[in-house]
């Protein structure tokens, strides 16, 4: 048998200091905030990230942003 099932109700997981610190972060697991929550904020950050990516793409392609600037690789 590859796995062994232990039916001992007295065995609990090991308690560590790190686990005690991280436990409050996991206490909200499965709970859903009513309404839209932070969805609007997430949308704003996604839009800002999209603008950032467009700016990087334009710089990479030397398009609209760099039209009037001479670029020399020598």
Swiss-Prot record:
SUPFAM superfamilies listed in its UniProt record: Photosystem II 10 kDa phosphoprotein PsbH (SSF161025)
Alphabetical UniProt keywords: Chloroplast, Membrane, Phosphoprotein, Photosynthesis, Photosystem II, Plastid, Thylakoid, Transmembrane, Transmembrane helix
Subcellular location as annotated: Plastid, Chloroplast thylakoid membrane
UniProt keyword annotation of GTP-binding present: no
Matching Gene3D superfamilies: Photosystem II reaction center protein H
Pfam family name, one: PsbH
GO cellular component: chloroplast thylakoid membrane; photosystem II
Domain of life: Eukaryota
Post-translational modifications: Phosphorylation is a light-dependent reaction catalyzed by a membrane-bound kinase; phosphorylation occurs on Thr residue(s) in the N-terminus of the protein.
Transmembrane segment boundaries: 40-60
Residues making up the signal peptide according to the UniProt record: none
Biological process according to GO: photosynthesis; protein stabilization
One term of GO molecular function: phosphate ion binding
Functional note: One of the components of the core complex of photosystem II (PSII), required for its stability and/or assembly. PSII is a light-driven water:plastoquinone oxidoreductase that uses light energy to abstract electrons from H(2)O, generating O(2) and a proton gradient subsequently used for ATP formation. It consists of a core antenna complex that captures photons, and an electron transfer chain that converts photonic excitation into a charge separation.
Name of the protein in question: Photosystem II reaction center protein H
Species this chain originates from: Staurastrum punctulatum (Green alga)
Gene it is expressed from: psbH
């Amino acid at each position: 048998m590859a796995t062994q099932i232990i039916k001992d109700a007295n065995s609990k997981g090991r308690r560590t200091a790190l686990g005690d610190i991280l436990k409050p972060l996991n206490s909200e697991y499965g709970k859903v905030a009513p309404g839209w929550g932070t969805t609007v904020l997430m949308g704003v950050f996604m839009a800002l990230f999209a603008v950032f990516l467009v700016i990087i793409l334009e710089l990479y392609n030397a398009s609209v942003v760099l039209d009037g600037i001479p670029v020399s690789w020598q």
